[in-house]
Amino acid sequence: MAFDKDAIIASLKEASILDLADLVKAIEDEFGVSAAAPVAAAGAAGDDAAAKDSFDVELTEPGQAKIGVIKAVRDATGLGLKESKDLVDGAPSVIKKDLNESDANDLKSKLEAAGATVALK
C-alpha cells in the first residue's frame, strides 16, 4: 500500500466533522496516543515566578487585632478610615498593586506585625 499524502488530505477535506472525530478516536486507540495539546512544563512557571518584578500585596485575613491592621492599611495606602476599614473587612483584598519586591515585603512585614495574614501575588 503506497502512502499518498495528497490523496489523504483530499479525503479529509471532504469528510464531515463527525467522521473526522471518529478517525481521531480510532487513531488514538490504535496507536495509544492522545490528540490533546501538550501543556507547558512546570519548570517554566517557576522561572516566571522568580523573574517577577511587580507584586500585589493581598490581605488574606485581618486576624484578631483588626484595629491595628486598619491603622496599618491606612498608613500604607493614604486612604481614609472608612475606606481602610472596608478593605480590611472585605478580606481577602488587595491593599496595594504593582509594588517592587522590597516595598511589597516591607508592607507585608508591617501588616503582619499588626496581626494580619498577608500574601504577595
UniProtKB/Swiss-Prot annotation:
HAMAP family named in the record: Ribosomal_bL12 (MF_00368)
Entry-linked InterPro entries: Ribosomal_bL12, Ribosomal_bL12_C, Ribosomal_bL12_C/ClpS-like, Ribosomal_bL12_oligo, Ribosomal_bL12_oligo_N_sf
Q: What does this protein do?
A: Forms part of the ribosomal stalk which helps the ribosome interact with GTP-bound translation factors. Is thus essential for accurate translation.
This chain is encoded by the gene named rplL
Q: Quaternary structure?
A: Homodimer. Part of the ribosomal stalk of the 50S ribosomal subunit. Forms a multimeric L10(L12)X complex, where L10 forms an elongated spine to which 2 to 4 L12 dimers bind in a sequential fashion. Binds GTP-bound translation factors.
GO CC entries: cytosolic large ribosomal subunit
Q: Which GO terms describe its biological process?
A: translation
Record the organism.
Answer: Oenococcus oeni (strain ATCC BAA-331 / PSU-1)
Record field: transmembrane: none
Q: What is this protein called?
A: Large ribosomal subunit protein bL12
- Please list the coiled coil stretches: none
Q: Which domain of life is it from?
A: Bacteria
Keyword set includes Ribonucleoprotein: yes
